[in-house]
UniProtKB/Swiss-Prot annotation:
Family: Belongs to the HesB/IscA family.
Co-factor: note: Binds 1 iron-sulfur cluster per subunit.
NCBIfam families: iron-sulfur cluster assembly accessory protein (TIGR00049), PRK13623.1 (NF010147)
Name assigned to this protein: Iron-sulfur cluster insertion protein ErpA
Lineage: Bacteria, Pseudomonadati, Pseudomonadota, Gammaproteobacteria, Legionellales
SUPFAM superfamilies, A to Z: HesB-like domain (SSF89360)
Assembly behavior: Homodimer.
Matches recorded under HAMAP family: Fe_S_insert_ErpA (MF_01380)
Encoding gene (name): erpA
GO biological process: iron-sulfur cluster assembly
């Protein structure tokens, strides 16, 4: 059998949903600094062993995974302005090991608004969803 025929497409490294992109764009606009990027990282701690972190960062390290998403600028009236904005998500290599295949989303509901990470690598998660065990 041909080795190429057995090759399956690899899943996306990380999914950055449109809702998350729009929220990040809004937060960057509030800071009035177009050079900001959203950095997602993993640190030790939390009730399950690891916890997610989010911060804004102007610096892009040479070994960062950079996910770029284009988003049409919204207008106060109807629809968009036709101009495109670029939003970047940054992940360092160590954190990427734990975030491979995860989805970063933004959710608003009756309980509040927050960034949500759906992580297929998490074996267990805490009730609040901000920490996990791998």
């Amino acid at each position: 059998m041909n080795a190429l025929a057995q090759k399956t497409p690899s899943p996306p490294t990380l999914v950055f949903t449109e809702a998350a992109v729009r929220k990040v764009k809004g937060l960057i606009d509030e800071e009035n600094n177009p050079y900001l990027n959203l950095r997602v990282f993993i640190t030790g701690g939390g009730c399950s062993g690891f916890q997610y972190g989010f911060t804004f960062d102007e610096a892009i390290n040479s070994d960062d995974l950079v996910i770029e998403k284009q988003l049409e600028e919204e207008d106060d009236d109807e629809g968009g302005t036709g101009q495109m904005a670029l939003v970047k998500l940054l992940v360092d290599p160590l954190s990427l090991q734990y975030l491979q295949g995860a989805e970063i989303d933004y959710r608003e509901d009756v309980s509040g608004a927050q960034f949500v990470i759906r992580n297929p690598n998490a074996k267990t998660t805490c009730g609040c969803g901000s920490s996990f065990a791998a």
